[in-house]
Amino acid sequence: MIDIVKYPVLTEKATRLLENNQYTFDVDPKANKITIKALIEDFFNVKVLSVNTHRPPRKKRRIGRSEGYRPNYKRVIVTLKTGDSIKLLPET
């Protein structure tokens, strides 16, 4: 699980999607929708309705004179069944 699903994303859009019971994660670029759905359902004990994936374009990175690119990643938006939820942040 840790190798495929790296971490949850908490951006403005991701927090807005939480109201629609949609959660955003960064995952391994080689992972497909079927394995992501199975991992999320098993690990968090929820029912996944849909999995939407996209691979944002790589950004250029410059360190001194050398120029390269940031690492590739895949972002996933997972829609859960109504009533199910994932606890991302600890309650204070």
From Swiss-Prot:
SUPFAM superfamilies according to UniProt: Ribosomal proteins S24e, L23 and L15e
Self-association state and partner proteins as the record states: Part of the 50S ribosomal subunit.
PANTHER family hit by this protein: 60S RIBOSOMAL PROTEIN L23A
Protein family membership: Belongs to the universal ribosomal protein uL23 family.
Keywords tagged on the record: Chloroplast, Plastid, Ribonucleoprotein, Ribosomal protein, RNA-binding, rRNA-binding
Any GO BP annotation: translation
GO terms for MF: rRNA binding; structural constituent of ribosome
NCBIfam families the UniProt entry points to: PRK05738.2-4, PRK05738.3-4
Organism, scientific name: Mesostigma viride (Green alga)
InterPro entries, per database record: Nucleotide-bd_a/b_plait_sf, Ribosomal_uL23-like, Ribosomal_uL23/eL15/eS24_sf
Disulfide bonds: none
Short name of any one Pfam family annotated for the protein: Ribosomal_L23
Protein name, entry field: Large ribosomal subunit protein uL23c
Residues spanning the signal sequence: none
GO CC term (a single one): chloroplast
Role this protein plays: Binds to 23S rRNA.
Predominant place of localization: plastid
Location in or out of the cell: Plastid, Chloroplast
